[in-house]
Amino acid sequence: MINHEINKLLAFSLKKGLIQEDDKIYSSNMLAGLFNLDNFYFEEISDVPSTATAILNQLLAYAVKENLINDTVAERDLFDTKIMNCVMPRPSEVINNFNRLLNNSPKEATSYYYKLSIASNYIRKDRIDKNITWKTPTEYGDLDITINLSKPEKDPRDIAKAKLSKSTSYPKCLLCKENEGFYGNINHPARQTLRIIPLELNKSKWFLQYSPYTYYNEHCIILNNEHIPMKISRITFENLLSFIDILPHYFAGSNADLPIVGGSILSHDHYQGGRYTFAMEKAPVEKEYSIKGYEDISVGRVKWPMSVIRISSKNKTKLINLAEHILTSWRNYSDKTQSILSHTGSEPHNTITPIARKRNEEYELDLVLRNNRTDENYPLGIFHPHNEVHHIKKENIGLIEVMGLAVLPARLKSELALIKENLIEKKKDISNDSTISKHNTWYKYILDNYKNISEENIDCILKKEVGIKFLEVLKHAGVFKRNSSGLSAFDKFINIL
């Protein structure tokens, strides 16, 4: 069995271009050594699978049976990455292939690199495919909703082992370049299948890789050569526009650089990008402005639940100058009527989530105004999801959510299934069920507003209402509200520019 599965993996790796014919003996010996085999022979494989998942599952079952590993998620992940490492091309080979294709076509280069990242199982597509996704139509466009099931639950045995393992500071974080080829441990994922592509952005060294948890098509991470903190500045705009010069079919954006309104990793400067059109990109400009000194740059307020200024021009330098001017002005802007205070003492609150793209041969920047202030009423953040939406989403609203893609917690899968049962049975109250009592107010709203709930329409109803809740989340995160007071305050800010 093991001999046959190794042959299947070799055939798969040849088919996907991970190895060449001349690499077969080398890779087979690497695999035989990994499994402590005394001998190996080649077989003809007629039916080559399209993914490595089934082969890896068979090889992992053998490793468990032979006591090479314990049957836990973490140990299986560490070991299957070791397996795939035996059939991986060297980093220099991947870089050379990427750059050769890039000279001809940026789309071909990223397509090659993305397919390689999936074939190598670095992007665990079998897990990502478990995510529950749908679109919810709203007045702001179709919002993308994802219930994130791709990160498996931690095994108690792995948790216990992690407590006993020695903590190390290498690599310093999950985004450091030193992750490439890293063997991994119980506290840090193996990255032997990671290949990173060096890029020069604005005369500084960066790297391109794909996110192992792709939330949208070709979801990439652009990471700084140095382990330095996130900082939104003029350099950010220069780097983002430099990136879309290299890969004009991608967008690139940055999380904000302050807690609450930033992403989950603020310690390592990085951006995210990819080949996907979000609802925010499709959202129209609802009001145009002219800014003195920048009359030749298009400036507009985007029709979006959060507060977005869209600027566009063919002149990259002028666009960067205006973006910097808006950022500097916003950093020090306060409007008490909208609960916006730029500082508490010396602590700054205002920042921007920027997104760059090319549209009709022009550079375009969406600048999303953010504020991370807290108060007694909103201890988690005034412009952060409020209590009434925490049953659906209470985590930070980062770059991906800002653009209109909800990444919702895995718990919702089972909770929505229970809510569905109760709604079909027309139960008046769910406050006694500890698993879903947090949804009680929302549950009653659905019960009151939909008179003919049935098996046939319940899924559509719940998907629609979850999407509407996410829209509410985005409205909470908007600094200028979508009412007459908020929109006139938005105009007031733009007029001071």
UniProtKB/Swiss-Prot annotation:
Family assignment from sequence similarity: Belongs to the galactose-1-phosphate uridylyltransferase type 2 family.
Task: Give the reaction(s) catalysed.
Answer: alpha-D-galactose 1-phosphate + UDP-alpha-D-glucose = alpha-D-glucose 1-phosphate + UDP-alpha-D-galactose
The record's InterPro entries line, in alphabetical order, gives: GalP_uridyl_Trfase_II, GalP_uridyl_Trfase_II_CS, GalP_Utransf_C, GalP_Utransf_N
UniProt keyword list: Carbohydrate metabolism, Cytoplasm, Galactose metabolism, Nucleotidyltransferase, Transferase
Looking up Pfam families in the UniProt record yields:
GalP_UDP_tr_C, GalP_UDP_transf
Q: Which HAMAP family match?
A: GalP_UDP_trans (MF_00571)
Organism this protein belongs to: Clostridium acetobutylicum (strain ATCC 824 / DSM 792 / JCM 1419 / IAM 19013 / LMG 5710 / NBRC 13948 / NRRL B-527 / VKM B-1787 / 2291 / W)
Record protein name field:
Galactose-1-phosphate uridylyltransferase
**Pathway(s) it belongs to:** Carbohydrate metabolism; galactose metabolism
Q: State any GO CC term.
A: cytoplasm
Q: Where in the cell is it found?
A: Cytoplasm
Task: Indicate the principal place this protein occupies in or around the cell.
Answer: cytoplasm
Which EC number applies? 2.7.7.12
Task: Cite the GO molecular-function annotations of the record.
Answer: UDP-glucose:hexose-1-phosphate uridylyltransferase activity
Is Transferase included in the keywords of this UniProt record? yes
Q: Which gene encodes it?
A: galT
Single Gene Ontology BP annotation: galactose metabolic process
What is the enzyme's class at the highest EC level? transferase
Q: Which domain of life is it from?
A: Bacteria
Is the keyword Mitochondrion in the record? no
